[in-house]
Structure formats: structure tokens, C-alpha cells
Amino acid sequence: MGAYRYMQELWRKKQSDVMRFLLRVRCWQYRQLSNLHRAPRPTRPDKARRLGYKAKQGYVVYRVRVRRGGRKRPVPKGATYGKPVHHGVNQIKFARSLQSTAEERAGRHCGALRVLNSYWVGEDSTYKFFEVILVDTFHKAIRRNPDTQWITKAVHKHREMRGLTSAGKKSRGLGKGHKFHLTIGGSRRAAWKRRNTLQLHRYR
């Protein structure tokens, strides 16, 4: 096994003494820093490389801190102005994951960069910490490489805002495996529409 394989196995056993100590110390360190800051290098190089990171010019890693828990509806004094069925304020669950939120915040802060992917690096009772891989699409090392030219196209601007990253697709119900089999037709809305539309073919 290569070195990255050993690192992968370490991260799989998060309850081991080594990882429990490491994660505890790192969470303390991350709490002292601002909620969005640039990391000098990936905390998990094995995971970052699997998600497309390369240790060369044009790649940047940002660490983002996101507060855990549900989403409270931002209304003044709980006044939602509507029918009682929509009066909920506190027990609201956000449609997207905290990882997707972290990607959005990093993409908003670094407007000239493109969000490639992200991964979990730690959590405590209050926060979750993610590292977001961003790409500088104006750098020659990215533009001249056939493997990374795809992200330089204008259609990939702010992919994190439109649910095109891995974390974003997950909350849209898109992916492979038994969890995503029901989303057939490109989106949940398309799947629902097809199931609820009566089609009477001429020859049936």
C-alpha cells in the first residue's frame, strides 16, 4: 500500500486514540481562527487528491467553519404572515447540507476562483469544519492543462451556487446507488411530474 492508502485508513478509524486526539486538538486550533481562512496546504492530502486537488500553481484550499444545527426562519418576532400551516419558525430544516453551505461561503468570498470540491476535516458540538478546493481559472497551469480546461469555461462560474458540486448534487437527489434511484429524469421535479402526469397514448 502507498502512503495515501495508510492515511485513508487512519481517517476511516476516527474513534482510534490517535485520531480522537488529533481531531480534538485541530478543532481547538480551528476555533481560534476566523470562520473562513486560507489553509497553507490540505489537512487531508489523500482526500484532496481524490477530489481533484494537485499540489501545483492555480490550486487553493480554504477552511470554512459552519455552525451546526437547523435553520431558524428569519422573521421579525416570529410573524410569518400566513396560514397556520406555514407558521413554523424554529424546527425548520435547511434543504442543503452544511458542506454545501461551506462551499457557497468560500465561493462568495473568492469570487474570481471556481469551487472544485470540498471535504470534512472536523467537528465539535457547535461547528463543522470543511476544507474547500478552489481553482484559479486564469492561471496558465490550469488553462493549458487538458485535464483542467473544463472548469475554465464560463458555464462553470459559481457552480457551488447552482448545486453542481458533489455536495450540491447530493441534496438535489442526483447520484449513483440506491439512495438516488428515485430521481429519474434529471431532477426531483421532473421525476414527480412524470409520475403525476397521465399519458394516454394513441395505441395502448
UniProtKB/Swiss-Prot annotation:
Q: Which residues form the signal peptide?
A: none
Q: Which GO terms describe its cellular component?
A: cytosolic large ribosomal subunit
Print the keywords alphabetically. Cytoplasm, Ribonucleoprotein, Ribosomal protein
Q: Where in the cell is it found?
A: Cytoplasm
Q: List the cysteine pairs that form cystine.
A: none
Q: Which family does it belong to?
A: Belongs to the eukaryotic ribosomal protein eL15 family.
Describe the subunit structure: Component of the large ribosomal subunit.
Protein's name in the database: Large ribosomal subunit protein eL15
